[in-house]
């Protein structure tokens, strides 16, 4: 996240808060120049007890972190709950672009958001009108450079952070080399994708979009039944072959941040050939996801935020994993076999109510990868933390008891 937490820390310090930081590796150290930092160089086994003592010694009342599924973070959250420390978890926005997720206690599959559509209709009806939408720029170049700097600092300081273990399945150096290879092939793959999209448009045939997620994404490994993307591809392609109308196409879109270590085009090709539908699958490495979503007949996803993008366009969505938006009246609630033939579109009143509740209680405007985005985000975080008691999600039982009374 680059300098995000340093900027948040400085803002909190300017307001008079005592701010502390724990670094796990050299990348963490690189992006924190403020006082109050401690390098944790111990083992994973010793981490919970270290943190427990640290919290008590420094009288910590609140903890801020990005994501809640990494092993060190999961252990930290367990300790913080035991010690009564308030938890604030950041994550990429449930709605993108222009938003960042900030929830108490947990996000995604650990979110407190309920699954009853009536809850959202009732809560949204009590909220003021939607605030004006603020569009913020985001730089892929900045994201890439900050990521490279973080990983380089991590590699160069492994001798110091001897016990640090990255949660990702590949060493940073391996990923870095693969990214360079991917960039070298970019021109060729862009041209191939443009040709595929041209042929798709000329065919005039309806298609279902399947946007791939990152293979190392913990949202797949912890919040779905899949071991990785290959398993999901197998299930989707097989179901498509058995149940989709013969005139329907399947468009599979590569994730823009995929590191290229696995050739997903080849994986998809072998799978399509095995199930006899290779000629009905369009694999796209590069392309405007918003346009692909708008023109799709439906979208099938594991738990990608592309799901909320599709729902906002009134495009039917099937969620294969745990997702915050997999709610009756919003996503297709039947099985995948029936989705190909008769996808259920979202009830837009319910989806808009759901979106309104997200923005009020779970999202902060802004972004990580531009100065304007960071300034907007820091301002929103300041306001959200200051009003955290008033901005707690309304109790499910209270809201639904009013309905069922």
Report each predicted region and the residues it spans.
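N-terminal subdomain of nucleotide-sugar transferases
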Residues: 1-25
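Active-site and donor-binding regions of nucleotide-sugar-utilizing enzymes
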Residues: 2-4, 24-120
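Conserved catalytic-core segment of nucleotide-activated headgroup transferases in glycan assembly
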Residues: 8, 15, 161-267
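Donor nucleotide-activated moiety binding/catalytic core segment of transferases
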Residues: 42-58, 256, 261-306, 312
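A donor-sugar binding/catalytic signature common to diverse glycosyltransferases
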Residues: 62-72, 285-331
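A short helix->loop->beta-strand "cap" motif at the edges of active sites that frequently abuts
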Residues: 82-87, 248, 314-315
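Catalytic core of nucleotide-activated saccharide and alditol-phosphate transferases
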Residues: 88-186
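Leloir-type glycosyltransferase catalytic cores
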Residues: 114-158, 329-405
């Amino acid at each position: 996240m680059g300098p995000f937490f340093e900027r948040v820390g400085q803002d909190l310090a300017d307001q008079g808060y005592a701010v502390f930081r724990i670094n796990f590796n050299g990348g963490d150290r690189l992006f924190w120049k403020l006082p109050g930092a401690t390098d944790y160089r111990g083992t994973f086994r010793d981490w919970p007890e270290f943190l427990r003592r640290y919290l008590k010694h420094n009288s910590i009342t609140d903890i801020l972190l990005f994501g809640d599924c990494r092993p060190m973070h999961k252990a930290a959250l367990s300790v913080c709950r035991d010690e009564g420390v308030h938890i604030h978890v950041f994550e990429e926005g449930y709605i993108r672009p222009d938003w960042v997720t900030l929830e108490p206690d947990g996000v995604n599959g650990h979110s407190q958001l309920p699954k009853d559509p009536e809850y959202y209709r009732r809560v949204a009806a009590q909220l003021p009108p939607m605030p004006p939408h603020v569009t913020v720029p985001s730089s892929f170049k900045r994201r890439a450079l900050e990521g490279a700097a973080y990983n380089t600092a991590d590699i160069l300081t492994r001798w110091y952070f001897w016990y640090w273990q990255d949660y990702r399945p590949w060493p940073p150096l391996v990923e870095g080399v693969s990214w360079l290879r991917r960039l070298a092939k970019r021109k060729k793959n862009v041209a191939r994708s443009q040709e595929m999209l041209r042929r798709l448009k000329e065919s005039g045939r309806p298609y279902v979009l399947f946007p791939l997620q990152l293979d190392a994404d913990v949202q797949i490994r912890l919040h779905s039944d899949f071991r990785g993307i290959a398993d999901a591809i197998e299930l989707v392609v097989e179901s498509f072959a058995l149940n989709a109308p013969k005139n329907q196409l399947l468009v599979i879109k590569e994730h823009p941040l995929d590191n290229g270590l696995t050739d997903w085009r080849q994986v998809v090709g072998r799978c399509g050939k095995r199930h006899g539908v290779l000629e009905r699958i369009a694999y796209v490495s590069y392309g405007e996801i918003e346009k692909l979503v708008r023109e799709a007949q439906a979208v099938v996803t594991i738990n990608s935020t592309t799901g909320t993008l599709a729902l906002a366009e009134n495009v039917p969505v099937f969620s294969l994993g745990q997702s915050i938006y997999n709610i009756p009246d919003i996503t297709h609630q039947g099985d995948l076999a029936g989705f190909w033939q008769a996808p259920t579109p979202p009830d837009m009143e319910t989806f808009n109510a759901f979106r309104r509740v997200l923005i009020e209680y779970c999202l902060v405007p802004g972004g990580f990868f531009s100065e304007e985005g960071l300034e907007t985000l820091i301002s929103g975080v300041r306001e959200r933390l200051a009003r955290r008691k008033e901005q707690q999600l309304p109790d499910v039982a209270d809201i639904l008891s009013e309905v069922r009374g």
